[in-house]
Amino acid sequence: MEHIRTTKVEQVKLLDRFSTSNKSLTGTLYLTATHLLFIDSHQKETWILHHHIASVEKLALTTSGCPLVIQCKNFRTVHFIVPRERDCHDIYNSLLQLSKQAKYEDLYAFSYNPKQNDSERLQGWQLIDLAEEYKRMGVPNSHWQLSDANRDYKICETYPRELYVPRIASKPIIVGSSKFRSKGRFPVLSYYHQDKEAAICRCSQPLSGFSARCLEDEHLLQAISKANPVNRYMYVMDTRPKLNAMANRAAGKGYENEDNYSNIRFQFVGIENIHVMRSSLQKLLEVNGTKGLSVNDFYSGLESSGWLRHIKAVMDAAIFLAKAITVENASVLVHCSDGWDRTSQVCSLGSLLLDSYYRTIKGFMVLIEKDWISFGHKFSERCGQLDGDPKEVSPVFTQFLECVWHLTEQFPQAFEFSEAFLLQIHEHIHSCQFGNFLGNCQKEREELKLKEKTYSLWPFLLEDQKKYLNPLYSSESHRFTVLEPNTVSFNFKFWRNMYHQFDRTLHPRQSVFNIIMNMNEQNKQLEKDIKDLESKIKQRKNKQTDGILTKELLHSVHPESPNLKTSLCFKEQTLLPVNDALRTIEGSSPADNRYSEYAEEFSKSEPAVVSLEYGVARMTC
């Protein structure tokens, strides 16, 4: 609380950034240790978690007061007008301090207390067991074994303790290969396809320069190739543009020389680096925040940002990986520069295409734990959790979630979860409310003792999983064993519910998704009514001589049925049930639930030119 000088300011205006008439709400602004809270004159609450704040800007004083603009990592933008400049200055300075902490222990997760005892906390962390996940895949087996070479993090600090490697790969080969790979990230197993006996492996770029080679690294790749009894050649996927990889050779890094590695086929897939992605997102947000933009100008700005082209590049890479396994029975080794950004994107998306388990709520959690958290995606740096280098911030994980959303749009019956689940996860990679995404690797998390001092997100999501269920999900999802998405440009849409989730006055529309949810609820209520009626009929059958159920009897069964009275077309829709539990998890009030009104349709085909009123923008190339 030492950073808070002013805790309450009255007569503050909250502007609607898309209103052409500068509409505003007047209320009171509160500053707490964890949140910024605005309560308007109608008692509607707007909660902003300090860790969600990406930037704070105090504009020049105007006749109506001092403007304060807050940009958030979850794409909320708020524009306050504070009556007194001194109060605005105090709030501004406080938010600068509270939104950028210097050490992990000051983050929200270390003070958040959901009133669970130590046993319940531990059970929450034990919910995801990666050893069980590898057993589900079918490893260890005659070709792959669990290695203890990195048990003490001596070979690679950013890898997990337990790693799966080819059975014929000895420890000297592993150690030698690690010395030839950037950050010591040598090739290890990420996913094993039992039916094809093929593997997805991951690593970082080799330190090959223009001519260097390493026999141990060559032997390890050969061991991966031999671990596939069906196909002896393997693909090496470099996820970078070829020019970038060639430029790294000048720095003593680069990519594998095919002359030195037997039975490999090399493939560049051209996903840009974190700096290009950060710039692209910034351009997208600038377009989104422009008031009074025409449809043509919005489309032009969206295309100029390049954002959807980058999403397509990630998706195409995952499709190539999946086809290499399913069509050619080939194992694939994936790497980028350091093996924790683009590599995580491609390995996780490829696994999602191949394995329907990862398309369930629990399976998706396992996938994130496996390919992102355990293998050292730098969540702390990429999400700007601490006051560090802004050039290390990049929306790598956001792109992954967006790719998954596009898959749910193309295959609405194949996923157990709805987009609300993806949005909730995105909320918490930035909230710092739970320990899962804190830190940059497992070793760092163990040193922070996160399992003893913080709580896991996953049990909270599972407890409320009914909120995230996809009503279109087919229990016979085995029909979608392998997903084969179509990546023609016009299949990529602007994800309105991600980037405009808080802009409630921007082209409101009724959600087909919400209609389906309410239809399900109505069907359940009708089924209950039928059972009640049958029970009443059975009880009164001796009294009913003509076999006709009277109006009085119907009324006695269900006298007040709002579901039967309310027309579906005019009923207010809500993507997620609004309750206090949701507020606890999100750090936002029920009345400000941004998921309402904006869900996209799952399977409706749309014309090539679509009004922004429908929340869809197509990419054109």
UniProtKB/Swiss-Prot annotation:
It is a peripheral membrane protein. Keywords: Cell membrane, Cell projection, Cytoplasm, Endocytosis, Endoplasmic reticulum, Hydrolase, Lipid metabolism, Membrane, Phosphoprotein. Expressed in CD4+ T-cells. The active site is at 336 (phosphocysteine intermediate). A 1,2-diacyl-sn-glycero-3-phospho-(1D-myo-inositol-3,5-bisphosphate) binds at residues 248, 273-274, 337-342, 378, 382. Residues 124-499 form the Myotubularin phosphatase domain. A 1,2-diacyl-sn-glycero-3-phospho-(1D-myo-inositol-3-phosphate) binds at residues 248, 273-274, 337-342, 382. Its EC number is 3.1.3.95. Its main location: cytoplasm. It catalyses: a 1,2-diacyl-sn-glycero-3-phospho-(1D-myo-inositol-3,5-bisphosphate) + H2O = a 1,2-diacyl-sn-glycero-3-phospho-(1D-myo-inositol-5-phosphate) + phosphate; a 1,2-diacyl-sn-glycero-3-phospho-(1D-myo-inositol-3-phosphate) + H2O = a 1,2-diacyl-sn-glycero-3-phospho-(1D-myo-inositol) + phosphate; 1,2-dioctanoyl-sn-glycero-3-phospho-(1D-myo-inositol-3,5-bisphosphate) + H2O = 1,2-dioctanoyl-sn-glycero-3-phospho-(1D-myo-inositol-5-phosphate) + phosphate; 1,2-dioctanoyl-sn-glycero-3-phospho-(1-D-myo-inositol-3-phosphate) + H2O = 1,2-dioctanoyl-sn-glycero-3-phospho-(1D-myo-inositol) + phosphate. The modification Phosphoserine is found at residues 556, 561, 589, 611. Residues 2-141 are annotated as: Interaction with RAB1B. GO terms for molecular function: phosphatidylinositol-3,5-bisphosphate 3-phosphatase activity; phosphatidylinositol-3,5-bisphosphate phosphatase activity; phosphatidylinositol-3-phosphate phosphatase activity; protein serine/threonine phosphatase activity; protein tyrosine phosphatase activity. GO terms for biological process: endocytosis; phosphatidylinositol biosynthetic process; phosphatidylinositol dephosphorylation; protein dephosphorylation. Optimum pH is 7. Residues 1-101 form the GRAM domain. It comes from the Eukaryota. It is found in: Cytoplasm; Endoplasmic reticulum-Golgi intermediate compartment; Endoplasmic reticulum; Cell projection, Ruffle membrane. The GRAM domain is required for cell membrane localization. Binds with high affinity to phosphatidylinositol 3,5-bisphosphate (PtdIns(3,5)P2) but also to phosphatidylinositol 3-phosphate (PtdIns(3)P), phosphatidylinositol 4-phosphate (PtdIns(4)P), and phosphatidylinositol 5-phosphate (PtdIns(5)P), phosphatidic acid and phosphatidylserine. Negatively regulates ER-Golgi protein transport. Homodimer. Heterodimer (via C-terminus) with MTMR9 (via C-terminus). Interacts with ALKBH4. Interacts with KCNN4. Interacts (via GRAM domain) with RAB1B (in GDP-bound form); the interaction regulates MTMR6 recruitment to the endoplasmic reticulum-Golgi intermediate compartment. Belongs to the protein-tyrosine phosphatase family. Non-receptor class myotubularin subfamily. PANTHER family: MYOTUBULARIN-RELATED (PTHR10807), MYOTUBULARIN-RELATED PROTEIN 6 (PTHR10807:SF34). This is Phosphatidylinositol-3,5-bisphosphate 3-phosphatase MTMR6. It comes from Homo sapiens (Human). The lineage of its organism: Eukaryota, Metazoa, Chordata, Craniata, Vertebrata. The gene is MTMR6.
